[in-house]
């Protein structure tokens, strides 16, 4: 008869006479899952005919489970590292794009104040005719939205015969804006890869946990009649991890 899902009882008492039970717990992290499987797979006694007691079907499931989880875990780390590294670069590009758009708008407002550009032209940029302050550009959506409007507005005004704004020119604004847009798209692709990696890991874990649980049940069942002082050591050699509750003595 197989041992229960999580707890293996140990016979020793605390000061109140309660039975103390070190308990096993299925791994909570992918690193712990991989370690549990690798410990078993690296144990030569797992495979020898004389020593083997684990069902071959379960052993044959353990190696693919380990390989798939390891591959998915490593791919997640690679994708996360790439996404994190790129985030540092995009911050600078965002700052540059925001600075050029903000400076362009400030020059535009000054030209309106001096009467060099009609107030009615502000609507070409998506602005109210009475606008005199730079709109909010500190969010990604705000910067992308206003950048597009400002570039389109300046081009429309120039087509109507207006004089171009300098320092910065709309060409400089457009260049930094386009670079930022490309970076945002790249970041989204990298984030999608991270999300895909997370989803693959999420889908793999239940099957891996099922294999580990089956293995641990068979291992504990095999050593169930041995005394605790040897039973736990044997089980640990096959990858089972035991925990003690707070203030419990680490006897075995």
Which stretches of residues belong to each language-model region?
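Basic/polar low-complexity intrinsically disordered segments
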Residues: 2-252
């Amino acid at each position: 008869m197989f041992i229960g899902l999580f707890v293996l009882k140990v016979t020793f008492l605390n000061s109140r006479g309660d039975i103390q039970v070190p308990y096993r717990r299925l791994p909570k992290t992918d690193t712990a899952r991989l370690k549990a499987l690798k410990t078993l797979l690296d144990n030569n006694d797992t495979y020898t005919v004389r020593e083997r007691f684990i069902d071959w079907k379960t052993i044959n499931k353990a190696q693919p489970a380990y390989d798939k989880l390891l591959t998915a875990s490593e791919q997640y780390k690679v994708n996360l590292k790439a996404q994190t590294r790129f985030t540092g670069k995009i911050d600078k590009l965002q700052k540059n794009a925001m600075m050029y758009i903000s400076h362009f708008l400030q020059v535009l407002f000054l030209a309106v104040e001096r009467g060099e550009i009609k107030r009615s032209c502000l609507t070409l940029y998506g602005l109210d005719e009475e606008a005199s302050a730079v709109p909010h550009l500190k969010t990604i959506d705000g910067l992308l939205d206003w950048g597009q409007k400002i570039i389109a507005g300046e081009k429309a005004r120039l087509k109507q015969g207006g004089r171009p704004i300098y320092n910065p020119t709309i060409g400089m604004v457009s260049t930094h804006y386009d670079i930022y847009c490309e970076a945002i798209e790249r970041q989204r692709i990298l984030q999608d890869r991270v999300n895909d990696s997370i989803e693959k890991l999420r889908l793999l874990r239940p099957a891996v946990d099922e294999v580990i649980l089956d293995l641990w049940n068979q291992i504990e069942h095999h050593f169930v009649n041995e005394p605790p002082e040897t039973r736990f050591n044997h089980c640990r050699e096959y990858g089972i991890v035991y925990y003690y509750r707070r203030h419990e003595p680490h006897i075995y």
